[in-house]
C-alpha cells in the first residue's frame, strides 16, 4: 500500500522537508494526499474552500513569506502555518509528517486499520486457511499465477478467527464490533450487522429472528425469493399478499395505494386467518421492498404512517437502494431517518452493499432501528437477532469482505458521502439529456413534461434536487402504472431506465413493430457494455459514484449506433455476430428488424405484458392449496413428480418458479399452477424454441430437450388418495 503524498502549491515558498512524494495542488483530486500546503494567494482564490468541500478533512498548512498575514477567518480551518526560511525546514517537516501520519491512520476505519496492522506484523501462521498467506498456492505454477494476479496482500489478509487479536465476527467483539458500531452511526441505525453472504442471507436472518409458524406476515408480492425462503419455507409464517404493479414495458412497480388501507388489510386477514382480523396489531412483520429492482422508490414515512400501527416490525428490503439518505431529495424515503415513538413499529433494513454501494460481491448489512420499542413484548433484543445471525453466518468468514463493509461506511461518512452521490445523480441526469437529444427510439424513463415544459429543458442543478422530475404522477401516460396515489412513488435517479420501441405510451398497447430490449442488451454486450438487466421493452443500467461522463457517453454512442443499424435494417450477422455464429442455420439471412419483428410478434401474440401484470394482481394470484413449508417438505421427501408444463395445470407447485433476474417468484410452493403464471411460462417456452440465443434464465422449472424441442418441466406434489380428484382434475 503506497504512502500518501503531500499536495503543494506552485506558489508556496520552499519551507519544509518531507520524505513523501509531492504533487502539484492543481493536478490533484486529493484522493491520495495526506496533507496540503497552500500559499496565502491560494486561499484567497478559493483553494481552501475547494478542499473543505470534499469532506475528506485533509490537514491544510499555509506557507507564508515576508511576514504575510493570513486573514483571521481562515485560521480555524487550517492545521498550521509555515514561514519561509531554511532554519525551520526540518521542524516544519516534523509537524507536517505528524499531521499526515495521523490523517493516514484515521482514514482507515476500525476493522480495516486493525487488519492492516495485523498483516504487517508478519505472524507465522499454523492455522486456517490452509493456503497460509498464499504460500501453499505458490508451491505450484497455477497457484503462483493465482497469487500474482490478485496480489499477496489479499492472501495475507485471509485470516482465521483462531487469533483473537482481530476480534470476533460472530459474537461481535473487538475491531468487528467497533466497525459495525461506526456503520450504525453513519447509516443512522441503532445497531448494524455486517453479513457476508448477500442480502439473501440478511433477509433470512431477520425473518428467522422474528417469525414463527402461524405468525401473520404482510408480504409484498414483489419480494425477492429470499423473503419467501425465510418467512414461508423456513419460518412457516402465514403470508398476506399485497398486489403490485407492472407496466407494459416490463418495469416492476410498487404496491397499489389501496393495499395500505387498514380496512382492506383486515379483509385480507379475514381470508387467511379470520380469528385474527380484529386484533389491534395483527402482523408480526411486514416485508416491503423499499425500492424495486426497476427503481420504483417508496416513501418510508407514508408506509409507516399507513400500516405501522398494525405491525410489530417492518422489514424494508433495501437490496436495490441503501444510498437514499445521502441524496437530499430522496432522504424522506429513508426508513433510517424516521423519527419514531413507542407506538411505531420496529424498523429493520437490509441492504445489498455490493449492488450500488462500495462492496465486494456478497457484502450486505442489516440495520436495526427499534430502541423506541425496547422493553415491549414485541421487541427483538440483540441476543435473539444474533442467534439468527449465527445460524446463517459462516464460521470461516472472509476478512476482506468484512473490511469492504467497513470501508463502505467510512466512504459514506459526512460530506464526502453526500458529494459522491450528488455527482452520481448529476451524471445520470446529464446522461438522460444526452439520450433525449441524440436518440429517436430509445427513451429514458422519466416524465416527458414537467409543468408543461420538456424534462430536459430544465437546468441539471434544479432536476438534481427536485423530486418532481422523477415522480410517478397518477394517470400520466409516460409510466403507464396504475393504482398509485399522489406522491407515493418516484423513479430512482440512480437507475438509468430506458424503454425500447413497441409500446404505445398513450394506451399501453402493442404497436405494429417493436424492439425487444434483450436484442439491445445483447448488442451492448457484443460491444463491451454490460447492462444490469432487461425485460420486454425495458433495460436497466445501475448508476453509482463509479460513473463518469466518459463512460456514460460511450453508452450513449452505442445507443445511437444501434438506432442507425435499426433504421438501415443491418444484417443480423453484423449486429449480433456471436449469436449469429452460434445459430447461423436458424438466422441465416436475417436482418435486425426481421429479428425484432419476430420477437415482438411473439410477445404480442401471447400478450406477455398483460400476463406479467396479471401474475402480480390479487385477482390472478395462483390459488393456495398447501402451506409453502409443507409443500417444500413434500418435495424433500420425494412426494413429487416431474411433469411437462401443460400437465402442471391444476397441480400443486413443489418449487417456486421464476425468471432470473429479477428473482421474484411467480408461483410459490403450495400454490396451484394455472392461469396467468402457466400461460407466461408457456410463452417463455415458445420463445426458447423459436428464438435460440435469447433464452432467459429460469429457476424452479427445468428445460429438457425431447424430440428436438426444448420443453419446460416442473415438480408438482403427488396427489394423495383423498385429494386425487381435486388435485388432478382441477383446471384454472
Where are the predicted features?
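Alpha-helix N-cap/helix-start motif at coil-to-helix transitions, marked by capping-box chemistry
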Residues: 173-177, 396-399, 518
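Non-catalytic terminal extensions of PLP-dependent enzymes
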Residues: 2-165, 173, 185, 264, ...
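Conserved phosphate-coordination/catalytic loops
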Residues: 170-177, 196-197, 255-263, 511-514
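A short linear hydrophobic-aromatic micro-motif
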Residues: 192-193, 350, 528-532
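Short glycine-rich or small-residue beta-strand-to-loop segments that form or flank ligand, phosphate
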Residues: 193, 286-289, 539-544
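Conserved acidic residues
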Residues: 31-36, 75-82, 190, 215, ...
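Long, structured ligand/cofactor-binding scaffold of large enzymes
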Residues: 140-234, 240
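Conserved PLP-enzyme active-site core in the AAT-like
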Residues: 9-10, 22-26, 39-57, 64-65, ...
Amino acid at each position: 500500500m503506497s504512502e500518501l503524498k503531500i499536495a503543494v502549491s506552485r506558489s508556496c515558498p520552499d519551507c519544509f522537508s518531507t520524505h513523501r512524494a509531492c504533487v502539484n495542488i492543481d493536478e490533484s483530486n486529493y484522493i491520495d494526499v495526506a496533507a496540503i500546503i497552500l500559499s496565502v494567494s491560494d486561499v484567497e482564490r478559493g483553494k481552501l474552500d475547494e478542499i473543505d468541500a470534499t469532506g475528506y478533512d485533509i490537514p491544510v498548512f499555509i506557507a507564508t513569506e515576508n511576514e504575510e498575514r493570513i486573514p483571521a477567518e481562515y485560521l480555524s480551518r487550517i492545521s498550521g502555518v509555515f514561514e519561509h526560511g531554511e532554519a525551520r525546514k526540518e521542524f516544519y517537516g516534523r509537524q507536517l509528517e505528524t499531521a499526515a501520519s495521523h490523517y493516514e491512520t484515521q482514514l482507515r476505519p476500525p476493522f480495516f486499520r486493525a487488519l492492516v496492522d495485523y498483516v504487517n506484523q508478519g505472524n507465522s501462521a499454523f492455522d486456517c486457511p490452509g493456503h497460509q498467506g498464499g504460500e501453499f498456492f505458490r508451491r505450484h505454477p497455477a497457484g503462483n499465477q493465482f497469487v500474482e494476479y490478485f496480489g499477496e496482500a489479499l492472501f495475507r489478509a485471509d485470516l482465521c478467527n483462531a487469533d483473537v487479536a482481530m476480534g470476533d465476527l460472530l459474537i461481535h467483539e473487538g475491531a468487528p464490533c467497533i466497525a459495525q458500531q461506526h456503520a450504525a452511526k453513519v447509516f443512522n441505525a441503532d445497531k448494524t450487522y455486517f453479513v457476508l453472504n448477500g442480502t439473501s442471507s440478511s433477509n433470512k436472518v431477520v425473518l428467522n429472528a422474528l417469525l414463527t409458524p402461524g405468525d401473520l406476515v404482510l408480504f409484498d408480492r414483489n419480494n425477492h425469493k429470499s423473503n419467501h425462503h425465510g418467512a414461508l419455507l423456513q419460518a412457516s409464517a402465514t403470508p398476506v399478499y399485497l398486489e403490485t404493479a407492472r407496466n407494459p414495458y416490463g418495469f416492476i412497480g410498487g404496491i397499489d395505494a389501496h393495499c395500505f388501507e387498514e380496512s382492506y388489510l383486515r379483509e385480507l386477514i379475514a381470508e387467511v386467518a379470520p380469528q385474527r382480523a380484529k386484533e389491534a396489531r395483527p402482523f408480526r412483520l411486514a416485508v416491503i421492498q423499499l425500492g424495486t429492482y426497476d427503481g420504483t422508490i417508496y416513501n418510508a414515512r407514508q408506509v409507516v404512517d399507513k400500516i405501522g400501527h398494525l405491525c410489530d416490525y417492518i422489514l424494508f428490503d433495501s437490496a436495490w437502494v441503501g444510498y437514499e439518505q445521502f441524496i437530499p431529495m430522496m432522504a424522506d424515503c429513508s426508513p433510517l431517518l424516521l423519527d419514531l415513538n413507542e407506538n411505531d413499529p420496529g424498523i429493520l433494513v437490509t441492504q445489498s452493499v455490493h449492488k450500488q454501494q462500495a462492496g465486494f460481491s456478497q457484502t450486505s448489512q442489516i440495520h436495526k432501528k427499534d430502541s423506541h420499542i425496547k422493553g415491549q413484548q414485541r421487541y427483538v433484543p440483540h441476543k435473539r437477532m444474533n442467534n439468527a445471525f449465527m445460524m446463517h453466518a459462516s464460521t470461516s468468514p472472509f476478512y476482506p469482505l468484512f473490511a469492504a463493509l467497513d470501508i463502505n461506511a467510512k466512504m459514506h461518512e459526512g460530506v464526502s458521502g453526500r458529494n459522491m452521490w450528488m455527482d452520481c445523480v448529476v451524471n445520470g441526469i446529464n446522461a438522460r439529456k444526452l439520450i433525449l437529444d441524440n436518440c429517436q427510439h430509445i427513451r429514458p424513463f422519466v416524465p416527458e413534461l414537467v409543468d408543461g415544459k420538456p424534462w430536459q429543458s430544465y437546468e441539471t442543478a434544479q432536476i438534481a434536487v427536485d423530486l418532481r422530475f422523477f415522480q410517478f404522477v397518477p394517470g400520466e401516460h409516460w409510466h403507464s402504472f396504475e393504482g398509485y396515489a399522489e406522491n407515493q412513488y418516484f423513479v430512482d435517479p440512480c437507475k438509468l431506465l430506458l424503454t425500447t420501441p413497441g409500446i404505445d405510451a398513450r394506451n399501453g398497447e402493442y404497436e405494429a413493430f417493436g424492439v425487444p430490449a434483450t436484442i439491445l442488451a445483447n448488442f451492448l454486450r457484443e460491444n463491451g457494455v454490460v447492462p444490469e438487466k432487461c425485460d420486454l421493452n425495458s433495460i436497466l443500467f445501475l448508476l453509482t459514484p463509479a460513473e463518469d461522463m466518459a463512460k456514460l457517453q460511450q453508452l450513449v454512442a452505442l445507443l445511437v449506433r444501434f438506432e442507425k443499424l435499426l433504421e438501415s435494417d443491418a444484417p443480423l450477422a453484423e449486429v449480433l455476430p456471436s449469436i449469429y455464429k452460434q445459430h447461423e442455420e436458424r438466422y441465416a439471412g436475417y436482418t435486425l428488424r426481421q429479428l425484432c419483428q419476430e420477437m415482438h410478434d411473439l410477445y404480442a401474440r401471447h400478450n406477455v405484458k398483460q400476463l406479467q401484470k396479471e401474475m402480480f394482481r390479487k385477482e390472478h394470484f395462483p390459488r393456495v392449496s398447501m402451506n409453502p413449508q409443507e409443500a417444500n417438505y413434500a418435495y424433500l421427501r420425494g412426494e413429487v413428480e416431474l411433469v411437462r408444463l401443460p400437465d402442471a395445470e391444476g397441480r400443486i407447485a413443489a418449487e417456486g418458479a421464476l425468471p432470473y433476474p429479477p428473482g421474484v417468484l411467480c408461483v410459490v410452493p403450495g400454490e396451484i399452477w394455472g392461469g396467468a403464471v402457466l400461460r407466461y411460462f408457456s410463452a417463455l417456452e415458445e420463445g426458447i424454441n423459436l428464438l435460440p440465443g435469447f433464452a432467459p434464465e429460469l429457476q424452479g422449472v427445468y428445460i429438457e430437450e425431447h424430440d428436438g424441442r426444448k420443453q419446460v418441466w416442473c415438480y408438482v406434489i403427488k396427489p394423495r388418495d383423498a385429494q386425487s380428484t381435486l388435485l388432478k382434475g382441477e383446471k384454472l
